């Protein structure tokens, strides 16, 4: 079937944009400046912890990110090592979940609702956010100091680009290598991603 040049050009541009799409962790602050070419590697290419860690609450926290994919799967790994330098230093602490939507997303992240154990006030940890929009796993890390009394500043906005996102919860995935699989299971419905992945309802932060 004949394809008009204009339509073909637009279709090609859309395809290229999809292939090059990524995500950017907004809060907590990532380990270093976003480097698109390095995001498929450990901690977006940053092997060493940040000099200035982000204070983060043991309960009632959230994560904000910008998604450039219309359909994506995500999960969180955590390391309690003082200087985590490889995937082997991290353990999966949330199920993987799938969501629809591009733009800014606020994902409630209550550490007390994850399977992480032994976390304490004042402890230094690192989280690694795993994101897959269909073109392979992408990674960004954030180095944190945990606090039982800290409240995230109201200047850090917790809002979502879409409230019509659907989600699927997934079981545990392997975390020992960069090629950990991101599977799916039946859908939860509106705002299901934050309940399935991070342990509390989206309604508590909107």
UniProtKB/Swiss-Prot annotation:
Keywords: Cell membrane, Cell wall, Copper, Disulfide bond, Glycoprotein, GPI-anchor, Lipoprotein, Membrane, Metal-binding, Secreted, Signal
Chief localization: membrane
Gene: X325
Induction summary: Expression is up-regulated during Laccaria-Populus ectomycorrhizae formation.
Binding positions for Cu(2+) per the UniProt entry: 22, 69, 135
Keyword Zinc on entry: no
Protein name: Lytic polysaccharide monooxygenase-like protein X325
Lipid attachment points (GPI-anchor amidated serine): 179
Disulfide bonds: 43-141, 106-158
Cofactor requirements of the protein: Cu(2+)
Compartments where located: Cell membrane; Secreted, Cell wall
Record CDD domains: LPMO_auxiliary-like
Residues with attached carbohydrate: 52, 89, 115, 124, 149, 160
Record's cofactor remark: Binds 1 copper ion per subunit.
Superkingdom of origin organism: Eukaryota
